[in-house]
């Protein structure tokens, strides 16, 4: 409550060009930068453990960072340090950094000491691909290459997408106040679509009329979706955890009137203690360990 609606998360199924069905989930993510990172890895690891016999090739976590956030938020360093640990690894994460060279109003030179925002990737000796955000084909090639590397080696991969932010950080930010020279240059710079269309036209792959038709088709689709959404009088939110919680019930006032019985039968406690503190007969323990085990057992049995 109080956060932006597009942070709610979403799950859907898609069919790839190869005819494969893939389930995609955008994890609910609060406006606290990078706080969702360990949640995403936890979801991935849980699925690997529960559904895929820990086969890292079956689930792939993807994180989309900002350049200022990945370099400045400590939680990023924490999850990357866990990337290859036995109890936490997920078979590699694809890190895509939208590097717009500014963090809200902070110039990148004032935001970090490292040369690149992706230098954190050196911790795990991960490959880092620096890609021109205006080169659509280079980005597509890099995504495929990063995925192939991840699937083969089970390691994290970083993509530093060097680009720019067309407008302010949000509706209340006027970037020309804080970065006037940068935004003067950005205002004169053609957008990636225009650059790619001109490239395809120069190569004889695309005609101008076809490009206009494709743009109109896309705009018409967006407009149709807007009109469709306006017909919905009340939005419903389906809990993505519903199936996991269906066997549980909500607590009632009656549940809190009296304290529950949490005691354990003495016989059961003694049985557990015996199982825990009985040393295997086929192993030889040092005297200090034997003494410690006996002392702990006595705490329960005496």
Located regions from the model:
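Cofactor-binding active-site loop characterized by glycine-rich and histidine/acidic residues
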Residues: 1-125, 129
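Metal-dependent DNA phosphodiester-chemistry modules and their immediately adjacent helices/loops
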Residues: 4, 8, 155, 181-203
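Non-transmembrane, aqueous-exposed alpha-helical and coiled segments at domain scale
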Residues: 36, 41-61, 73, 105-116, ...
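Short glycine/threonine-rich loop-to-helix capping motif typified by GTGT followed
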Residues: 70-77, 109, 169-176, 222-226
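Flexible glycine/proline-rich, aromatic-decorated loop/lid segments
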Residues: 89-95, 107-125, 161-194
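Conserved thiamine diphosphate
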Residues: 116-142, 189-211
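Active-site capping/gating regions of soluble enzymes
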Residues: 129-158, 167-179
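Hard-cation-handling environments
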Residues: 192, 203, 207-302
